[in-house]
Structure formats: structure tokens, C-alpha cells
């Protein structure tokens, strides 16, 4: 009688093959090969030809002279005046530049994500978690040449894994100019575009070849919700167009073997109390129209801020709390509804603790 049955022999053969693989690679990798790339990664802006870089510079200045960077389409000459965002064309207003450890693990890694928090925004979210710098100009002004110097400091002194532009929708031309200047000076880490997804297609086109990782936050679905909570009734149309364009440029999120993201789209959705159904619609649209392999972060850290819960006057003149329906933390049941809908729609790559003891890719 044979020592092992044919079935057991096949199982043991597969096990031995896996052990051999692990011994050669010295780590357990839990990801499909399409999402793994070799290090070192060469950022997209380092691959631009001198001619393409010159075209980017020219287009950047043209956008500032007739601003159409976001769907508000102010069309103002920002060298002479300002539009909805209140930021001129000669500089950017920056609140903080520093290694940041509050991002997704695949972005912050060990040394942090080199975050540049811009002041100002093209939305007016009533629940804004950073309203103190987003709803007004609060920071210091930097010309593109000065911003470029800071990007290099994030790389050399901070040893950051990437440069992370936070709320940059209204300063895209200045960002492009700064990255191109820094590239000539030795910048070589990926660029993260951390956006509310209220971008114009012209803006995303200008960023093509500059940005490595798009980090959009798709906030709400219904026009009435966007009008009430974001003060931008056309938010959904703009977000759908811009997210699809981002994915067309860089594809699904890919990593080096150390678990650090290098290129692709990582989409966020902050679940708002009472609006989980809109999160469900967003997940269904993403799976059907963008990619089932899209990396998604369903976020649960909503907290009443900005105008939510502030005292106001009702229709009859009685004192009441503004936006009382979202004046509470989000419930985990609401978050779970969105996550389950995402899985049912076909999405499977999530930012959450790994079930297998490794890291989720």
C-alpha cells in the first residue's frame, strides 16, 4: 500500500513548492502579481520629456489666466483677482508642511507621508473636518520656486515616502510648476493628489504625467445632498468624471514589496450619519464604471465640526441647532452597510486590518 494517496501527494507537493518560494523571498506576500512592482519606482514626472515639461508649464500659466480648475468655472484671471477659492495665481497659501502619520498605512509607511496642507478650498462642506484652514486663508504664502524647496526637504530631511498635496484642487497650476522645478533639483518620490474629487477634467489633464497616486474622497451622491452639505449641487457629475479620468491615467493601486503604494487610485468615502444609502450608491457606481479592483477606504471618523451643531434660527425664529440630522458621530452599523454594499458590488480591495496576518494590497 502506498505511503501517501495521490491526493495527499499533490497537497504535499504544493506545500513544498510554497515553502521553497517563501525561503527565496524572505517574506509572505498576499497579493496578486498585477499589483506588485519592483523597487525602485520611477515617478511619472521624472519620465516627462523636456518638451512635455515645457508644455505643462505653459498650460499651467494659461489656466491661471482664465481659471477653470474646478467645476465652478470662475474664469477669472488669478494674476489680477481671485475666484471662489480666494487664492491668487502667483503663490499658494500653505498651512502645514510636515511628515504626516494620519494617512493610510500604504502611504505613511515608516517615515510618514510628506503632506502639504493647503489653505482654501473650492467646496464649503458644512461638516468639514479641516474647516479652520479650508474655509479661510490661514497660512503662509509660497511661490512655486519656494514650494519646490520644501518638497525636497520632505524627501531629504523628512525621508518621506511621497509628497502628499492635501486639498490642492484650487492650486493645481502652482503645484505642477513646483513639482517640475523640484524634479530638476532631484525630487524622486511619488506625488499624491489628495482631493475632494471636485475637479475639472482640464485640471486632471494638466496633472497627467505629474501625479502618481490619486487620493479622491467621493463624498455624497444626491444633488440635493451636495447642494445642502457641500454647497455644490453638481458635485456628483464632477466627481464621477474626475475619478474616471484619474483611473484612466494611473489605473489600480500598485505597491512595492514593502507594502508602500507607488501608483494608482485609492478612493476614500467618509460615511456621513444618516447618509449610508448614498455611500451604497457610490460603491455600486465605482464597481460598475471604474474598476472592481479599485482600492477603497470606507472611513468611519466623521465627527460634527464646522457649522454642524452650531446655534441658529429656524423658520419660525426659534433657536435650534444647525444641521441637527448630522450632529452626531457615525454609527458602525452605517459604516458596515456601506462596506457590505461594496463587497456585494464586486469591490474587494479595502484599507482595513489584514485577515491573513500580512498586509492588505
Q: What are the language-model segments listed below?
A:
Residues 118, 167-169, 193-197, 218, ...:
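A cross-domain feature marking catalytic cores of carbohydrate-active enzymes
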Residues 178-190, 241-249, 332-338:
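Alpha-helix-loop-beta-strand connector modules within alpha/beta enzyme cores
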Residues 197-201, 220-223, 232, 272-274:
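Short, catalytically relevant binding-site loops at active-site mouths
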Amino acid at each position: 500500500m502506498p505511503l501517501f494517496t495521490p491526493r495527499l501527494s499533490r497537497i504535499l507537493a504544493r506545500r513544498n513548492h510554497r515553502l521553497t518560494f517563501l525561503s527565496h523571498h524572505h517574506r509572505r506576500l498576499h497579493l496578486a502579481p498585477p499589483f506588485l512592482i519592483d523597487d525602485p519606482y520611477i515617478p511619472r514626472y521624472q519620465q516627462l520629456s523636456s518638451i512635455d515639461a515645457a508644455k505643462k508649464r505653459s498650460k499651467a500659466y494659461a489656466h491661471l489666466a482664465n481659471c477653470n480648475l474646478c467645476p465652478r468655472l470662475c474664469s477669472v484671471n488669478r494674476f489680477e483677482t481671485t475666484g471662489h477659492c480666494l487664492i491668487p495665481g502667483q503663490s499658494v497659501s500653505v498651512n502645514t508642511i510636515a511628515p504626516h502619520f494620519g494617512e493610510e498605512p500604504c502611504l505613511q509607511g515608516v517615515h510618514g507621508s510628506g503632506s502639504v496642507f493647503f489653505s482654501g478650498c473650492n467646496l464649503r462642506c458644512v461638516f468639514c473636518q479641516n474647516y479652520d484652514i479650508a474655509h479661510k486663508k490661514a497660512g503662509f504664502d509660497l511661490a512655486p520656486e519656494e514650494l519646490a524647496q520644501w518638497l525636497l526637504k520632505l524627501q531629504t530631511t523628512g525621508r518621506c515616502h511621497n509628497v502628499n498635496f492635501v486639498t490642492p484642487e484650487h492650486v493645481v497650476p502652482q503645484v505642477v510648476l513646483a513639482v517640475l522645478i523640484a524634479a530638476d533639483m532631484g525630487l524622486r518620490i511619488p506625488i499624491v493628489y489628495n482631493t475632494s474629487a471636485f475637479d475639472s477634467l482640464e485640471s486632471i489633464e494638466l496633472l497627467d504625467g505629474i501625479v502618481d497616486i490619486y487620493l479622491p474622497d467621493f463624498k455624497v451622491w444626491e444633488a440635493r445632498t451636495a447642494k445642502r452639505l457641500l454647497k455644490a449641487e453638481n458635485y456628483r457629475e464632477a466627481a464621477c468624471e474626475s475619478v474616471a479620468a484619474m483611473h484612466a491615467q494611473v489605473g489600480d493601486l500598485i505597491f512595492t514589496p514593502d507594502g508602500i503604494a507607488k501608483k494608482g487610485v485609492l478612493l476614500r468615502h467618509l460615511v456621513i450619519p444618516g447618509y449610508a444609502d448614498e455611500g451604497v450608491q457610490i460603491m455600486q457606481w465605482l464597481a460598475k464604471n471604474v474598476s472592481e479592483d479599485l482600492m477603497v477606504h470606507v472611513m468611519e471618523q466623521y465627527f460634527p465640526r464646522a457649522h454642524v451643531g452650531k446655534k441658529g434660527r429656524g423658520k419660525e425664529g426659534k433657536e435650534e441647532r444647525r444641521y441637527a440630522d448630522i450632529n452626531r458621530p457615525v454609527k458602525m452599523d452605517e459604516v458596515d452597510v456601506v462596506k457590505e454594499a461594496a463587497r456585494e458590488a464586486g469591490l474587494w480591495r479595502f484599507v482595513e486590518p489584514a485577515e491573513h496576518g500580512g498586509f492588505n494590497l
